[in-house]
Amino acid sequence: MEIQIIRCLQDNYSYLIVDKAKNIACVIDPSEAKPVIKYLEDKNIHLKYILNTHHHYDHVGGNKELKEKYGASVIGYKGDKDRIPEIDILVGDQDIWHEENFQAKIFHIPGHTLGHICFYFYNEESVFTGDTLFSLGCGKIFEGTYSQMYNSLMKIKALPEKTKIYCGHEYTKQNSKFCIAHDQDNENLKVKIKLIDEKLEKNLPTIPSTIKEELECNIFLRSGTEENFSKLRDLKDNF
């Protein structure tokens, strides 16, 4: 399996997981269809599945066109069946989604939205976190509560440290400014910021991160308590 980052819209990331042996793929959160189709056509790959972490338009905007073009099945959270366009397959917390050679465990991680999920592709040691966990940050709380978001982050935090994190946006530089402002003596964070700057100078994605890196550097995962997390989230909203 190969994971390919697809840049979409202004700062979104969609992801293709490609089974190179079968020349088929699934796509995570297609913000728009065009860049996904271009990659698939350039590589002569057939799209079989569309996986959505949540219902926001910048994560499902390509569903309809991709489904019509490839006959791909759309997978999303059962509680969002009326909000995810073209949905076919409903999944819930702790389910294992397994089609072809694609296997992922589903975690329900409400907070950013009430129906947010992540896809943990355990064989690939990779988790697709949408807008819940970012590199050095976390998503804004639009529908859920502070408690829900904190507990959702704790679920992701518990994954193996070597797990790679693929999130929904390139927000890492701005997130790093907030982290260092509130964690000025964190040497691991200083090293990570240097690497982030080097990647961005070369127009490279700062993604993936890893659970280990986020445990060392992400102030939201290091907050310690729900109360501290809530205060930090409020500060970030006005940063």
Swiss-Prot record:
Note describing how the cofactor binds: Binds 2 Zn(2+) ions per subunit.
Protein's pathway: Secondary metabolite metabolism; methylglyoxal degradation; (R)-lactate from methylglyoxal: step 2/2
Enzymatic class: hydrolase
Protein name, as recorded: Hydroxyacylglutathione hydrolase
Assembly and oligomerization: Monomer.
Role: Thiolesterase that catalyzes the hydrolysis of S-D-lactoyl-glutathione to form glutathione and D-lactic acid.
Gene: gloB
Record HAMAP family: Glyoxalase_2
Taxonomic source organism: Pelagibacter ubique (strain HTCC1062)
Pfam families the record matches: HAGH_C, Lactamase_B
